[in-house]
């Protein structure tokens, strides 16, 4: 038994050594075939002597049980995101802020690293043994991915070396090599499976796969970018760089592209160097990360609830690619606006395959002087939105055909009219244009309008195409037998939709105005109009002068409202919706008087978390009916933050700003007081 135990231990040490060289030092000192042979030997020996298998054995990275679900796990300290900048001025402003928060005579150096485009995770080691791993999640709570993280070869299950803390937290990125990503997608295409759009998505999907064995097959890579010692056993480590090097000595992978910079010139030179190397790397990066190197200064500078003040991501300018323009299609929006969209040969930019980009309006087509088959330059603004930058006219063929903005609607063939003030071209045929009809109907029954559960774009499109509906009125006469003939609509779903249509008849003037889809009239403007006119008939009979008196409603929107109710077909439809379809508008005058008496009247409120008693939309509706103003962002002007379970960073931001915080029980009590 002793000789077998020694042999097992020897094989483990050899394999762990090879893994360290390969994954941490990027050195291959053994062939794949030799490694597989040694691995098989160890596997077979451990299979016969299961009592000798430790948790850090190389064999424990395969054959794990299949997870049923991922449980939530709280981080020991928040996993914050980074502030971003795309230019030198942004970096200089960041440095200026740091100088203000410390004494100017203190030496200041920065640790500069690659900003890997991967999935952020946290790993905990106790006594040098891997015990758990979690995704970032919302920064305060992530998913327990321990079983899957064990399958990543570059994550050591047992640390080596000396001075290992009793408890250690490692933070870093999990990513997939571009070469492995291409192989994975080829495999998926052969099996006719849905493939991944970019390496980051592939890494995220693989890391959260229900079967850890699949995670193991995907060849994910981990790279450390930070750590924390819960028991301060390494007092000699005073800088971020020293910590990273210590992690490397323990066998934790750290990317080799790290420099210490003491001047602006050094940082900019490093940024330019990495920008030039970017396209030649086998993994995606989207910039560099600049961190104050001194741990003492990091602590002194501190963090906001969202990001550390001592670090910033200096992102690359949008990447550009040259491709060929194939076509420009003219789309018709809900309000009749014609939007040109360019279609071109697909190009891969910043990890995403792009084949189309909005051209916004007629002016943009004229600016670019577009012709069919033009050679064009494409980029992603902010590494997100596809944009056609310019045309390389020198490559244009002599007989190239110029792209002309249409004079008639591409869907209904109605003559288009140009609004010079708005810089827009519209089809004014309204609901007689199928493209506008479909989108207008979806808007009419959307969540912020007269919400009907289950009535999505696919069902509405099919109802229009089958001639079952032509305008909103027709929906109130639908029967379940009409819906059953549609794709994927059974008896139960049809009844659910019909019942929801009946319920949506009772609404507010604000929701009704918004549902009409008048150009420029969003949710906020609809509320202002409702509060000003109080009654629908007053709005319908208003003139331009009255409309211009409404605060926040400009000349263009006033004209749009006046033109809408001046159109006979629109007026007839509104009257039929009220008198025939039976839409009932809550009395706005009584609502306004009552809302002024409530605790929430005219208060700016922000919501965060999940609420027990009602959905987010229901709660917003209740608060708005009480005269509240709902906002998405916390500021010093916020009156209340109302929070539920699993609240996010807004809660801590509110505390920092001394904003009054209301929990679910207090909220229920306040709502009952009103009632």
UniProtKB/Swiss-Prot annotation:
Q: Which UniProt keywords apply?
A: DNA damage, DNA repair, DNA replication, Ligase, Magnesium, Manganese, Metal-binding, NAD, Zinc
Positions that bind Zn(2+): 409, 412, 427, 433
Name a Pfam family for this protein: BRCT
SMART domains referenced in this protein's UniProt entry, alphabetically: BRCT, HhH1, LIGANc
State where NAD(+) binds: 32-36, 81-82, 113, 136, 173, 291, 315
Q: Where are the transmembrane segments?
A: none
Q: What is its EC number?
A: 6.5.1.2
Q: Entry's CDD domains?
A: BRCT_DNA_ligase_like, LIGANc
Reaction(s) the record says it catalyses = NAD(+) + (deoxyribonucleotide)n-3'-hydroxyl + 5'-phospho-(deoxyribonucleotide)m = (deoxyribonucleotide)n+m + AMP + beta-nicotinamide D-nucleotide
Instruction: List, in alphabetical order, the Gene Ontology terms for molecular function in this entry.
Output: DNA binding; DNA ligase (NAD+) activity; metal ion binding
Q: So where's the catalytic machinery, residue-wise?
A: 115 (n6-amp-lysine intermediate)
Write down the required cofactor(s): Mg(2+); Mn(2+)
Q: Which GO terms describe its biological process?
A: DNA repair; DNA replication
Entry keyword DNA damage? yes
Q: Which domain of life is it from?
A: Bacteria
Can you list the GO cellular component terms from the UniProt entry? cytosol
Q: What class of enzyme is it?
A: ligase
Q: Which residues form a coiled coil?
A: none
Function, in words: DNA ligase that catalyzes the formation of phosphodiester linkages between 5'-phosphoryl and 3'-hydroxyl groups in double-stranded DNA using NAD as a coenzyme and as the energy source for the reaction. It is essential for DNA replication and repair of damaged DNA.
Question: So what family is this one in?
Answer: Belongs to the NAD-dependent DNA ligase family. LigA subfamily.
Database matches in PANTHER family: CHROMOSOME TRANSMISSION FIDELITY FACTOR 18, DNA LIGASE
HAMAP family in the cross-refs:
DNA_ligase_A (MF_01588)
Its recorded name reads DNA ligase
Source species: Buchnera aphidicola subsp. Acyrthosiphon pisum (strain 5A)
Its taxonomic placement starts with:
Bacteria, Pseudomonadati, Pseudomonadota, Gammaproteobacteria, Enterobacterales
Please name the gene that encodes this protein: ligA
